């Protein structure tokens, strides 16, 4: 009884900085990802109930993916790290990177990425009316748009509602760490 009530009372609304942008080389990256997904294997059950969830270190030697991950790391550095008062210079490293293919009925349950500093989602293939990325604490919804990236502190709980359409909704996701 009491523990349940306490957990409801302890919900905190976070005023976290969420970075949303459009990747300059989206057309080239998206074409490459769609091609590579033809050969990807599904890792099975995760908190993402997608028809395909690639491995956690997907396409580590693909130059377009390497460039994209470098871009995301630089966005994190410029949007978050320059605000730190610390005299130490941190490097931002991509810890893992994967793809998700959502088909009708697929979703992602509420989760976070607490073992990491930052996370991101990137829309490879989606319509504006497809399921959004939803941050639970604020109820902020980020509508999909091909080429759009969303970077956020990894502690933010988020989910993706059930995909209701017959076409695929395809995303890339990743987690990043800070190292000295």
Model features per residue range: what roles?
Residues 8-90:
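Non-heme Fe(II)/2-oxoglutarate
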Residues 85, 90-162, 167-171, 175-180:
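Catalytic core of non-heme Fe(II) oxygenases with the double-stranded beta-helix
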Residues 2, 57-59, 99, 129:
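Short linear interaction motif-like sites in intrinsically disordered regions of transcription factors
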Residues 1-9:
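Short, Lys/Arg-enriched N-terminal segments with co-localized hydrophobic residues
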């Amino acid at each position: 009884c009491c523990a349940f009530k306490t957990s409801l009372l302890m919900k905190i609304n976070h005023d976290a900085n969420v970075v949303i942008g459009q990747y300059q080389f989206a057309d080239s990256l998206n074409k490459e990802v769609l091609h590579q997904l033809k050969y990807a294997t599904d890792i099975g059950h995760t908190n993402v109930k997608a028809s395909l969830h690639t491995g956690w270190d997907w396409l580590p030697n693909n130059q377009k993916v390497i460039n994209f991950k470098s871009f995301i790391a630089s966005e994190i550095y410029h949007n978050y790290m320059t605000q730190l008062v610390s005299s130490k210079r941190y490097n931002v490293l991509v810890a893992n990177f994967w793809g998700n293919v959502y088909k009708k009925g697929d979703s992602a349950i509420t989760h976070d990425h607490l073992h990491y500093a930052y996370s991101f989602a990137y829309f490879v293939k989606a319509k504006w009316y497809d399921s959004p990325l939803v941050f639970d604490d604020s109820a902020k919804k980020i509508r999909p748009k091909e080429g759009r990236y969303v970077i956020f502190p990894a502690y933010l709980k988020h989910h993706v509602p059930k995909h209701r359409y017959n076409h695929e909704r395809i995303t890339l996701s990743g987690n990043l760490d800070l190292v000295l």
